[in-house]
């Protein structure tokens, strides 16, 4: 069972790395005219960093068989999951608003109501859903 958890964690990390790269490459880290994000970089990188730390703890647990490390990794994952839920809720809310704005104005689909192109709206839906499924 521990190996299955490791495999799903690695798959989840792969989808997460893809989403992080897409978000960063589409303007998530820079604030230039016409682009932006509603996902603060500190939240994105805290989610990423804690998830990576939890994965490392889990690997160390597998090697040492320390029950304490398993519980610390679990507690870490609770925080990671909460941050992930906050971000996916914002992503979905912005996606609905962008679709409504595009339908009303004929503007770009990924823009918010003020016309700002949101970096997170360039992340396709399938990786977000699969990341969430494998995380559970």
Residues covered by each model-derived region:
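Polytopic alpha-helical membrane-helix bundles and their juxtamembrane interface segments
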Residues: 1-136
């Amino acid at each position: 069972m521990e190996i299955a958890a490791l495999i799903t964690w690695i798959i989840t990390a792969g989808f997460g790395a893809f989403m992080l790269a897409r978000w960063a490459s589409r303007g998530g880290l820079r604030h230039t005219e016409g682009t932006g994000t509603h996902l603060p970089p500190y939240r994105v990188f805290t989610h990423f960093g804690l998830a990576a730390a939890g994965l490392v703890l889990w690997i160390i647990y597998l090697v040492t068989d320390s029950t304490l490390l398993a519980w610390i990794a679990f507690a870490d994952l609770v925080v990671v999951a909460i941050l992930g839920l906050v971000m996916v809720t914002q992503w979905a809310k912005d996606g609905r608003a962008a679709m409504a704005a595009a339908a009303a104005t004929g503007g770009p689909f990924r823009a918010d109501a003020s016309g700002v192109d949101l970096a997170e709206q360039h992340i396709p839906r399938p990786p977000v859903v699969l990341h969430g499924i494998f995380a559970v």
